[in-house]
UniProtKB/Swiss-Prot annotation:
Pfam families: ABC_tran. Belongs to the ABC transporter superfamily. CcmA exporter (TC 3.A.1.107) family. It comes from the Bacteria. The gene is ccmA. This is Cytochrome c biogenesis ATP-binding export protein CcmA. It comes from Xylella fastidiosa (strain Temecula1 / ATCC 700964).
Length: 215
């Protein structure tokens, strides 16, 4: 898994990040970067701090020390980061009493939409056209996961942070996610994704960051 050289500045660079909880070290010090067109895969067992790292990068938690540069800007605030980052947690983050299509329109109003994509197109991409008017609470777990992928496909953000995106996906869903990721990276986007075990195989430049217990 090797990355191709890039002359463009990194989409994200982290330097000496540390984080502790109740005086117990959880992360760090961590140093890494994500270039346009590549994926950084963060691997480590459950409880090692993968989700914590993503929340720090998304601006939802504060690191104890270290620096984060996003599009060369130093330690941007959470509202500024939302313009550059799409964060997909292990929870769907969907409105249960809205339809699948209404959810996508609602999220687009909050975060913006890729200029060449529409919610209806997104539902077609993930195979949910027939469920456009179905309330989210009536969708299966697999369908909710696909709707989350539709939300990701619509995002205009250049950097995607994905918390165990391959969890609970069937083979067709894995193929779909690989297609969405590959399309994003081929347009010089970047992604950081976490996995507790086996590494996903992507036809794009990738690097590995293996998290270990903080000293």
């Amino acid at each position: 898994m090797t990355a191709l050289p890039s002359s463009a500045p990194p989409l994200l660079a982290a330097h000496a990040l540390t984080y502790s909880r109740n005086a117990i070290p959880i992360l760090g010090p961590l140093h890494f970067h994500i270039n346009p067109g590549e994926a950084l895969i963060v691997q480590g067992p459950n409880g090692i701090g993968k989700t914590t790292l993503l929340r720090i990068l998304a601006g939802l938690l504060h690191s104890d020390s270290g620096h984060i540069h996003i599009n060369t800007h130093h330690n941007t605030t959470a509202p500024e980061r939302t313009r550059h980052i799409a964060y997909l947690s292990h929870l769907p983050g969907l409105k249960q009493d809205l339809s699948a299509l209404e959810n996508l329109h609602f999220l687009n109003a909050l975060h913006g939409c890729h200029p060449q994509r529409t919610p209806s197109n997104a539902l077609t991409i993930v195979g949910l056209t027939d469920h456009a008017q179905t309330l989210v609470r009536q969708l299966s777990a697999g369908q909710k996961k696909r709707l989350s992928l539709a939300r990701l496909w619509l995002s205009p953000a250049p950097l995607w942070l994905l918390d165990e995106p391959y969890a609970n996906l069937d083979p067709e869903g894995i193929t779909l996610l690989n297609h969405i990721l590959t399309t994003h990276l081929h347009t010089q986007g970047g992604t950081l994704l976490t996995t507790p075990g086996a590494l996903p195989t992507l036809p794009v430049p990738t690097r590995l960051l293996h998290l270990q217990k903080a000293p």
